[in-house]
């Protein structure tokens, strides 16, 4: 049976972790799966919830980072910490990435003609301004790397793409690292949900800085 590792960065997500585990368990019933929660030096109680879940469910493991490196550094660490899987899924902890879509990504990856499958972003899941600016970023990323123009950080990836991501530790973005690897990828449309709790840790300034750094990194590798 294919071994699936789901890698999730955690920062200020204490309120959604229990639901995340429960919904993944339902969505992945009948599959061999494991959840790697990467707590990104979160000061607000997420680590305690993650450790409690790991203590009661052997499918849940926790990586605790002592320095906050951001979403993409946490994803990279989580991928590195799950070497025994056959396929990997990266997703957010805030439930905007619906766990019920994970089998869709895995099944498309299992068709064998691509090495990564992105959840193509759909829906009114954040403010119009964030959707517009995020869409512009993804359009430029697509022009630079050949990524699908709706690609975000909810994706399933195979061994070659995981290796490419881990071989690019300086990349500010796991998504752009996948694009620069020039492996065959695709996307399937997935409606994102409105965040049920809290707000994004990404401020407008942080989003802009991340976009500029990651696009410049990709441009230099064309």
Question: Where in the sequence are the language-model features?
Answer:
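Cell-envelope/extracellular polymer assembly enzymes that use nucleotide-activated donors
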Residues: 3-5, 34
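Short, well-formed alpha-helical segments that are part of the catalytic scaffolds
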Residues: 13-27
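Acidic helix N-cap motif at the loop->helix transition within catalytic regions
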Residues: 16-18, 44-53
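Short beta-strand/loop segment that forms part of the nucleotide-sugar
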Residues: 31-42, 63-64
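A conserved acidic beta->alpha catalytic loop
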Residues: 39-48, 95-96
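Acceptor/aglycone-binding surface of glycosyltransferases and processive sugar-polymer synthases
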Residues: 66-67, 71-81, 99-172, 193-205, ...
């Amino acid at each position: 049976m294919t071994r699936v590792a789901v890698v999730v960065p955690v920062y200020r997500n204490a309120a959604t972790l229990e639901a995340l585990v429960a919904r993944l368990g339902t969505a992945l019933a009948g599959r061999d799966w494991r959840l790697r929660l990467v707590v990104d030096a979160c000061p607000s109680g997420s680590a305690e919830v993650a450790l409690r879940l790991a203590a009661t469910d052997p499918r849940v493991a926790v990586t605790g980072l002592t320095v906050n490196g951001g979403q993409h550094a946490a994803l990279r660490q989580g991928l590195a910490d799950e070497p025994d899987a056959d396929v990997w899924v990266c997703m957010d902890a805030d439930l905007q990435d619906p766990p019920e879509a994970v089998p869709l990504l895995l099944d498309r990856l299992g068709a064998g003609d691509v090495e990564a499958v992105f959840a193509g972003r759909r829906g009114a899941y954040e403010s119009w301004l964030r959707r517009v600016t995020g869409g512009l970023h993804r359009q430029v990323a697509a022009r630079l790397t050949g990524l699908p123009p709706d690609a975000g950080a909810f994706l399933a990836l195979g061994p070659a793409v995981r290796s490419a991501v881990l071989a690019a530790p300086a990349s500010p973005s796991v998504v752009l690292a996948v694009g620069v690897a020039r492996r065959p990828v695709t996307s399937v449309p997935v409606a994102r949900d409105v965040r049920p709790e809290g707000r994004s840790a990404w401020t407008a300034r942080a989003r802009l800085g991340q976009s500029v750094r990651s696009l410049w990194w990709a441009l230099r590798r064309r």
